[in-house]
């Protein structure tokens, strides 16, 4: 045996343990939180798992699952181009939020802080529900105190979105009448 491989003195050795303990460092990206960015990322993940390039079984497009009629309202007329352009999708989402905030501004002021069907009503919950079911259906839900709880084609209700997306700070979104991308 060569002298370089001989053990001449006691050596510290680590033996395998019965259980391996892994230490992980948690990294919290800036979008995890209660800001507009946190809101849009959470909603985008719920709608499409964050996939910009997906079309669902009902023809809704992109990360935020927009319908053609809603896109047309905001001045987007080419669905193929929309689907391939993440930046356009982000602009369209913001534009739609400003539009819904304009349509629902009086209802936001009237119902914010109240409880309907056990759900605390917040501005962000209202805007998320409007993204799901349309501003008119959210108005009906609020004004009927939850008796008109419309669901989408997959069975997700207005009250579910009100709860899931409540509590975000959307003060950065300014209401705008008839906005265009």
Predicted feature residues:
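Extracellular glycan-associated modules
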Residues: 39
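Short Gly/aromatic-enriched secondary-structure transition segments
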Residues: 57-61
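Polyanion-binding surface elements
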Residues: 43
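Short glycine- and hydrophobic/aromatic-rich loop-to-beta-strand nucleating segment
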Residues: 64-66
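Non-catalytic cell-wall polysaccharide-engagement segments
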Residues: 1-32, 36, 46-51, 55, ...
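Alpha/beta-hydrolase active-site loop
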Residues: 91
